[in-house]
Amino acid sequence: MSNSIVIQTNSTVIEDMKQQYKHSLSPKTPQGGIFMAKVPSCTITAYKSGKVMFQGGRAEAEAARWQTVSQTPKTAVKKSVDSHRFAPPASIGTMSIVGSDEVGTGDFFGPMTVVAVYVDAKQIPLLKELGVKDSKNLNDEQITAIAKQLLHVVPYSSLVLHNEKYNELFDKGNNQGKLKALLHNKAITNLLAKMAPTKPEGVLIDQFTQPDTYYKYLAKQKQVQRENVYFATKGESVHLAVAAASILARYSFVKQFNELSKKAGMPLPKGAGKQVDIAAAKLIQKLGKERLPEFVKLHFANTEKAFRLLK
């Protein structure tokens, strides 16, 4: 018998959900709907009214992932994602800052990596000279060359959430947004402890969700960094600390990805496109479906697509 659960939430959480399910979105949206997504054993439909319906065998488990951040419905207000009380000051680009960024959240294969970096204001010219900028504009060779120098120049904290642990935490009701928040907070906390007694003038997080939602995700954590913490989208263009964090996160991710390919005994593609489905199907044939959680993020729609290719 198919279950059906409806929760009431707000526009911020719905936008977060849409981002979370971006690889599973259906081209069809019902009247009054914002999006429809299909994941294994569950269909999720979000409506403009703030209601979200979960249908299918895993409806209860899927809904549980979002209910903790949906307890206080708010009226949807049209405003910029950067319009909030946690926006950085105009002068932040010249300040001594801890910046954090993550890599691997949109890749079916490979881990999620988060890095926090401290850049003293006096180091900014040096980082520019090293070629530090958004890692998306650099190839793997450039990333490696810059990262190897950065490792000896800036204090940092690097965290890797491997696939098996990622899937385990996800199955316990932690959506990807919450996992990112936990890793960012932990990386920043670790770095601040490593730096002590030196204190940064602020902390800049490359914004992946609204700050209020970020702190809701951390509600049960014993240590939460709140002092002079700022959020901004495209944080790498706001301060070089985020750009440096992005480079070190990508460097770590690429190393982990190469190790994973060796473990698989075959080259693994990045991203979440059709080539990933084909590679996953080959991996299942080669190692068996029970080994899949070691290599992939199981909740991606690619899992179902890979199994379809084997039929």
UniProtKB/Swiss-Prot annotation:
Localization, UniProt: Cytoplasm
Known cofactor(s): Mn(2+); Mg(2+)
Superkingdom of source: Bacteria
A Gene Ontology term for the protein's cellular component: cytoplasm
Residues of the RNase H type-2 domain: 95-311
EC category name: hydrolase
GO molecular function term, any single one: RNA-DNA hybrid ribonuclease activity
UniProt keywords, alphabetically: Cytoplasm, Endonuclease, Hydrolase, Magnesium, Metal-binding, Nuclease
One Pfam family in the UniProt entry: DUF3378
Metal-binding in keyword set: yes
Catalytic reactions on record: Endonucleolytic cleavage to 5'-phosphomonoester
Biological-process GO terms, alphabetical: DNA replication, removal of RNA primer; mismatch repair
Binding site for a divalent metal cation: D101, E102, D206
This enzyme's EC code(s): 3.1.26.4
Cofactor notes: Manganese or magnesium. Binds 1 divalent metal ion per monomer in the absence of substrate. May bind a second metal ion after substrate binding.
Family per similarity comment: Belongs to the RNase HII family. RnhC subfamily.
Function: Endonuclease that specifically degrades the RNA of RNA-DNA hybrids.
Cross-referenced PANTHER family: RIBONUCLEASE, RIBONUCLEASE H2 SUBUNIT A
Name of the protein in its database record: Ribonuclease HIII
Gene source species: Bacillus cereus (strain 03BB102)
Gene: rnhC
